[in-house]
Amino acid sequence: MDRGYIYLNKKSFIHNLEVLKNLSRKELCLVVKANAYGHGLEWAVKNANASGIKWFAVASVDEGMQVKKVYKESRVLLLAEPSKIQLENIKENDIDLTVYNESFIDTLIETRDEYSVHLKIDTGMHRLGCPPEKF
């Protein structure tokens, strides 16, 4: 059986980003995990940046470093919890962290370093996140 293929149109991609930017009037964060869902991380970051997108979300530290390689001034949010040994790369590459449990907060405190963090709070979907009463 042949594989299916999707071809992305650069003009349409940028147009869609512009529509989203105009609807939200807020800074957008483009999720580019898993090689931009198979569409090519480098392609997605370059073209999104051409549209003014400066913030990208990834699933791994390696993906975050790839984004920084394509667009050094980008802001990168790591969606997954990294291992303690990855924290040095995170610090060196100025990657924001997602915090969704107390044990990871304790790990960050133990390092005595400063990190940009985003709290993921479980508001009822029961996927990931700290219960609101913890904060």
Task: Indicate where each model-derived feature is located.
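Positively charged, low-complexity intrinsically disordered leader regions
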Residues: 1-23
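Active-site-proximal beta-alpha core segment in soluble small-molecule metabolic enzymes
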Residues: 4-7, 26-135
